[in-house]
Amino acid sequence: VRDLLFGVPSGLPPLADTEDPFADALALVGAQVTRVIVDIPAGVVGVLLELRQSTRLRGTTALLRVTGAVRQEWTGSASANRFTAWSITDAAVDRDLTAIRIALHCLPAGSLHLTGTAADFVLLSARPDRTPPSSTDPAALLRFGVVDESTVCDPLGAAHLRSSAPFPRH
């Protein structure tokens, strides 16, 4: 996953409109935000998504990558903790000539807002470590099987959006 934060390889199969969040942002509903990785000097924000609860996206995980990032804002519930699963209940993608704005609204009471000049969405088939963690580590047990930036993944397909490109057609 870490390599995809630096660049999405060309030649990946394009996603069908039903899986492309830039054609239909509601494709993200049901996915869970598991990690947000911010690289300030590079202007890159990566959002890892768990897909086991998604009804529209194949694969086990996905990476939503925003480049030329100028805004990354998370607003979350005060009652949330490290065990909270942030399930996407609504999403919006807005694009004009200078910026792409992505909003992910989650339960319980969380929102992620990203603004940048380009975005990529890559569906992945993850190969997480299958060695069960110690039963005395509840945090590790909870995250067992969930992808992080060091997990080996196989890309299944990608969608791309640029601020100066025509908006995808449905």
Go through the PLM ranges and name each one.
Residues 1-170:
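Surface-exposed, interaction-prone regions used to assemble/regulate multi-protein complexes
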